[in-house]
Amino acid sequence: MLVARERKYCSVCHQLGDGYHFGAIACKACAAFFRRTTSMNLAPKFVCRKKNECVIKMSSRDSCKSCRYAKCLHVGMNPEVVQAIQQAAKQANSPGIESLPSCSSSPASCNSPILSLELGDYDQMTPTLCGVMESYQKLYKKRYDLHAPKLTPRATNYGEFCKIYSNDVYLQFEFLEGSFPQFKEMGGFEKKHVFKYFFVSFLILEMGYRSYQEGTDAIVLANGDFIDTMNLDEFYYDPESLEKCKPTDAMKMYRPNFDQMKRNVFQPLSHQKLSLIEFLALVSLCTWNESLDGQPDCYYPSCRPVRQSVIADLKAFYEKDSPDVDPAYRLSGLLMLLPALERSVELFLQTMEVKRLFRCFPFHDKIYKIIDGQ
């Protein structure tokens, strides 16, 4: 006879726990956060904006890493256990990824805060963004099904990058349809034009957000692998000489693009300390941008209502979940990120044309067709 296991709550954020982790009952999300923070010695970099008095709960656990880590220690999570596991792994000569030590298992483990998120707290408070979060959860679960056999993230090369996003593009399309009924109701021709800009802006935003979440300078990709921007010669590795330009030339040509993306998007995202709901709000605001040229006529009437709904959701979220946060100040910080993101998207699109023109590490044909709205 099967006996139902008693589910205890996470000692840190109070969602359903996953058992004992490092000395205390915790969910997968808080266990991963504690392991990552301890192994990378990130705690000294954390700063609380509220005099170290933040209330840590499921819906706001990402808002203050300093107080979250302090609570992990308070409830009994032991850093020495993390260090002992690391030392044992080194002695066993197990493969490790020094550039991205925060991810040590499958993509699902790296992204467990999203996969384990309960949406009940958000449904009435942020109805529009709740729908986007639910769709984003589905995207992550589908990615897990696609990439689960790979247990350890690693530095990827250019060819693998193209394959990853040639497969992921279909999942992103489903994510956009599931997030916004305005998009789902469009015709096929109109959807292609809207998705073109969404694909690039979402690609850049998500890479920046995931890299911030992992606390790494590497660029984290959809499947959990990463681009080691400190060693771009490995990214542009071309052992069979299939490309018309040398890897060294590609590094010189494209490194300014990586630097621009980090400076204008990734670093501001990290400075803003985005929560998940804020990241998805940025995705929504970028998707429905009435200042974009070349979109179908049916697109523009939806932009302002969607944006107003997203901003209203954020305001409600701040007032209920973070009463000490000035909504106007926080919102202005988010909106200031948008112009730099738009410039990065334009540069990305221009670079794609250069790649194709000179056949210097061009993207997969499938990606070009998407960008061209075919």
Curated annotation (Swiss-Prot):
Orphan nuclear receptor. Its main location: nucleus. PROSITE patterns: NR_LBD (PS51843), NUCLEAR_REC_DBD_1 (PS00031), NUCLEAR_REC_DBD_2 (PS51030). The keyword Metal-binding applies. Gene3D superfamilies: Erythroid Transcription Factor GATA-1, subunit A, Retinoid X Receptor. The lineage of its organism: Eukaryota, Metazoa, Ecdysozoa, Nematoda, Chromadorea. PANTHER family: NUCLEAR HORMONE RECEPTOR FAMILY MEMBER NHR-57 (PTHR46011:SF29), NUCLEAR HORMONE RECEPTOR FAMILY MEMBER NHR-86-RELATED (PTHR46011). A zinc finger (NR C4-type) spans 10-30, 48-67. The keyword Cell cycle does not apply. One of its GO terms (molecular function) is zinc ion binding. SMART domains: HOLI, ZnF_C4. GO terms for biological process: innate immune response; regulation of transcription by RNA polymerase II; response to hypoxia. InterPro entries: HNF4-like_DBD, NHR-like_dom_sf, Nucl_hrmn_rcpt_lig-bd, Znf_hrmn_rcpt, Znf_NHR/GATA. Residues 7-84 bind DNA. GO terms for cellular component: nucleus. Belongs to the nuclear hormone receptor family. It holds the Pfam family Hormone_recep. It comes from the Eukaryota. This is Nuclear hormone receptor family member nhr-57. Residues 124-374 form the NR LBD domain. It is found in: Nucleus. Keywords: DNA-binding, Metal-binding, Nucleus, Receptor, Transcription, Transcription regulation, Zinc, Zinc-finger.
